[in-house]
Amino acid sequence: MNRGVLESSPVQQLMAAGNPNWWNVSGGMRPPPPLMGHQQAPLPPHMTPNNNYLRPRMMPTPFPHFLPSPATSSSSSSSSPSLPNNPNLSSWLESNDLPPESWSLSQLLLGGLMMGEEERLEMMNHHNHHDEQQHHGFQGKIRLENWEEQVLSHQQASMVAVDIKQEGNINNNNGYVISSPNSPPNKSCVTTTTTTSLNSNDDNINNNNNMLDFSSNHNGLHLSEGRHTPPDRSSECNSLEIGGSTNKKPRLQPSPSSQSTLKVRKEKLGGRIAALHQLVSPFGKTDTASVLSEAIGYIRFLQSQIEALSHPYFGTTASGNMRHQQHLQGDRSCIFPEDPGQLVNDQCMKRRGASSSSTDNQNASEEPKKDLRSRGLCLVPISCTLQVGSDNGADYWAPALGSAGFH
């Protein structure tokens, strides 16, 4: 009896759990499965992983702890209904060479539980497939946004999936269904995979953002350098232009004071030329060249007059007289004929030359006199004055009556 109590304890626990698959045993009816296209309703809080998916699915040997022996089960099987038509259970019984009559109600209940779990696994496979499609769609969007981010996230997601598959294979080999990739009824498993993949995607995005930030910072550095470089280039260009300007000869720009002095000098020069024109030829040509030529001729005439008047004081020999005459003859061409008052008669010049020669001879015969150059033109010979006065008649050199010698 104690074994019967022990055998019925898991059945009571399963009945208390409220599994809807018990409809298979009681009436052969089961609730309608949810639609394949819709998402599965959230599991109740009592359907935890410890209660649903940590139980043995298909044990290779008869259940030594939960299933009674054929001798003890015959008493309890009399009150149980007939074995339902379960192909999976019948195939398992045939493979283990056990008669169907030797199973009790607990075994039938376990068979129904396994059938319900298989259907739930199929539903969860569909749900997982739908989640994977959504996840792949999200990855496709990320792939369109950033190809590098998608590659990194896909690699990490594939690595996580491989790890999960390996864990699922190990758990299936041990006989437990914990976290297979095709059956994710465990919300914690699904959330861990999705969160790990999303976290990996976020990490990749953050890393890529960091890389982008680094590149932007790098570009910022270049841009800042570029912002600093245009003044440098302009300064270089300015320096080159300054260097080129220094290589060129700068123009000598006169100061305003020098310009004013030049203007003043020009005005003064023009005024002086006008005054010279009034002295030389007031009724002649007014251009600068003609005024200068007339002024030059007039100056030469004055020089010849001065030499003729100062000749008795300088010439002492005949050779000097000859040179003086030649010089006077050469200067006659420069005398202006249009000024008759300034001309000297040739005869007067000849007489002056003869008198000067006679006086020179007398001076040579007499004692040498002192040179009168230091005294200037204060003394004039009487012979020269008489000749000039007798020839012209209007000369102011006329001597006084009864005077002889020097004034």
From Swiss-Prot:
Q: Where is this region: Disordered?
A: 56-93, 176-260, 350-370
What the entry lists under InterPro entries is as follows: bHLH95_bHLH (IPR045239), bHLH_dom (IPR011598), HLH_DNA-bd_sf (IPR036638), IND-like (IPR045843)
Quick check: keyword Transcription in the entry?
Answer: yes
Q: What's any one GO cellular component for it?
A: nucleus
**What stretches pass through the bilayer?**
none
Composition skew (Polar residues), residue ranges: 354-365
Q: What is its main location?
A: nucleus
What are the BP-aspect GO terms?
Answer: regulation of DNA-templated transcription; response to abscisic acid
| Subcellular location, record wording | Nucleus
Q: This chain belongs to which protein, by name?
A: Transcription factor bHLH68
Question: Organism, per UniProt?
Answer: Arabidopsis thaliana
